[in-house]
Amino acid sequence: MPILLRPRELEGLVDMKSAIDAVCEAYRGGTEYPVINAPRRRVHSPAGVRVSNFPGGVHALGVIGSGTRAELVRQAEGNQHYEFREHPVHVLNDSRTARLLAIVLGEVTEKTLGPSSLMAFRTAATSGVGFRYLVPENARSAGLFGSGGQAAYQLLALLTERPSISNVRVYSRDPENRRRFAEKYSKMFGVEIEPVDAPRAAVEPVDVIVCATNTNKVLFDGNWLHEGQHVTGIIGGNIQLVQGGFLKESRRELDDRTAERADLIVANLRESVSSEKQGDLWIPIERGLIKLEQIAELGELAAGKRAGRTGARQITYHKNNNGTGAADLAVTMLAYQKARALGRGTEIAI
């Protein structure tokens, strides 16, 4: 019998390593059987309410279905923020029989960090797949842009895949926020975290750069990058924000030079780069600096169809450019399996 899972019943069920493994399988399966995954679809009301739909599945986990979330989106001072976010709703069906398994209300939370924001867990687990294939295996240092919940989740994913990292430099616009972040998470994660006063200090001396903000503006100059570094960015954006008059131009966090200098660019889905005209990659494509076909997909790396990092001097760039139903359902299915084993949830008679 299917069950209903509420937010409090999703707490403490899934760890970051398990989530990264599941999301990796989601992208691998989506590459080998493309019709089981699809880009997100979004609609906007004139008042700024956005509804995002994420259809997809992970056949290896026995799940297919969709996720939906609604939020009141605002743009101010170069940042996107959410005046209100409703709990997401995921519908899980058996990918072999079509039978309903569960209706899941709320965010799946990570064991270590607890409640997430902006789908931070799935986003970080997706970055984690990129870290697995693109970050130098002997990486020792990282630069982190952002000091909120998304940044904490991204850092945990990085440390999960590269436990060799012992030093992190964090930059955000608010000095007090970055100081508090460094104090809290250096203790929690057991690494040195140093708040820095300028973006360049989080870029030049490190092996890995992770952008975990909600900005609409470029965070650093791509000319600051040096050989061997990896960059992850998480701002996707969608053309409807411009078409609806919410933004004058596409959202960006990374500049043209970053894309131009990268030896390997990876996106979650190439289709979303063009269909949503996502600024960080679409603008340099339009300007003739890079080509869409040179961008690898995350699932191609996971399936072994394209290589990840192959040399110590490569600059690699993962554009975690949008969520997918397959990734959402991978993490949600893990939570469902654990919850069911623990006797959580309310049976639904249908």
Predicted regions: what they are:
Residues 201-205, 224, 258:
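Structural alpha-helical scaffold elements that stabilize or flank donor/cofactor-binding regions
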Residues 225, 230-307:
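Rossmann-fold NAD(P)-binding glycine/threonine-rich loop
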